[in-house]
């Protein structure tokens, strides 16, 4: 069976890097801002952006807030709603805590925008990030639950990019904001599929004034996937898992993006009937016996070492 349903037909405007869409169904102008157009997105639903005259962009992330990106040298905007956080470019001293974002910054050639990391050098799976930290171009400033506030302030941090884990420690977010550091909680993990997650590249393109590069990189990645989706499904079954310290098996729920990538690549995710209690739950824990009964005949076993570490046998 063809898997074209994973790949929407991109509108012609998007294929020609039309970051400035033609949709003129305008929301009400905000204070002195004059609405121009809504930024076109093809897959992502967990953020939106409205573009205003003068290069101002309002980013809206559900349950995470609204952010007005102000171009370098542009005038301040009067009478903004209280919930809007102003991000003035250049955003070149970023404290990056959300590890999934690092690869997107690499693709935007924007590592020099990151001054601080929430992960130590040895913890990075992105080689460019590890090297930058080893060379002292990016400094460690503590994990999401225990940031080094002194170092963050000394570095002149312009933005902290967190994932939703910080919501379990709301006092951290509050303290950063109290010190004048704006906090953006990214929600790419709540997207419905891999291409939607990847489209967050465009959000960082907006923040870093690299929208054309972000759109071009995204277009190229979509094209790379397109021919794969045209191929017939191989029928090979795949189990993707890790083992916790208390000997439980962690697997991805059926609708998770990893399971979707298996299907996009032509495989069959073996746990095709597992869903979490909430839509935000991406993993499910199984007893060893249950996992073995389902996975023993799988054609491919993929062990996820990024969470629990590399598995050792004795």
Label each residue range with its predicted role.
Residues 231-313:
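Flexible, glycine-rich surface segments
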């Amino acid at each position: 069976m063809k898997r074209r349903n994973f790949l929407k037909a991109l509108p012609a405007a998007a294929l020609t890097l039309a970051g400035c869409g033609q949709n003129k169904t305008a929301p009400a102008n905000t204070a002195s801002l004059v609405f121009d157009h809504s930024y076109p997105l093809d897959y992502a639903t967990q953020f939106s952006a409205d573009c205003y005259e003068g290069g101002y962009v309002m980013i809206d992330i559900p349950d995470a807030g609204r952010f007005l990106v102000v171009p370098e040298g542009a005038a301040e905007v009067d009478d903004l709603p209280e919930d809007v956080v102003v991000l003035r470019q250049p955003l070149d001293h970023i404290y990056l805590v959300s590890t999934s974002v690092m690869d997107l910054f690499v693709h935007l050639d924007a590592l020099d925008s990151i001054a601080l990391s929430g992960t130590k050098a040895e913890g990075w799976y992105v080689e460019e990030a590890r090297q930058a930290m080893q060379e002292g171009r990016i400094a460690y400033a503590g994990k999401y639950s225990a940031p080094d506030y002194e170092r963050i302030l000394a570095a002149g941090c312009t933005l902290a990019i967190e994932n939703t884990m910080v919501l379990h420690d709301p006092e951290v977010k509050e303290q950063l904001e109290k010190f004048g550091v704006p906090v953006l909680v990214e929600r790419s993990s709540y997207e419905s599929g891999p291409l939607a997650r990847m489209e967050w590249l465009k959000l960082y393109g907006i923040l870093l004034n690299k929208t054309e590069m972000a759109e071009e990189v995204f277009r190229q990645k979509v094209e790379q996937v397109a021919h794969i989706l045209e191929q017939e499904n191989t029928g090979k079954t795949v189990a993707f898992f890790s083992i916790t310290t208390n000997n439980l098996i962690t697997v991805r729920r059926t609708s998770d993006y990893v399971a979707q990538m298996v299907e996009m690549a032509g495989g069959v995710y073996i746990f095709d009937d597992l869903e979490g209690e909430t839509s935000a739950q991406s993993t499910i824990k199984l007893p060893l016996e249950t996992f073995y009964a389902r996975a023993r005949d799988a054609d491919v076993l993929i062990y996820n070492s990024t969470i629990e570490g590399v598995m050792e046998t004795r």
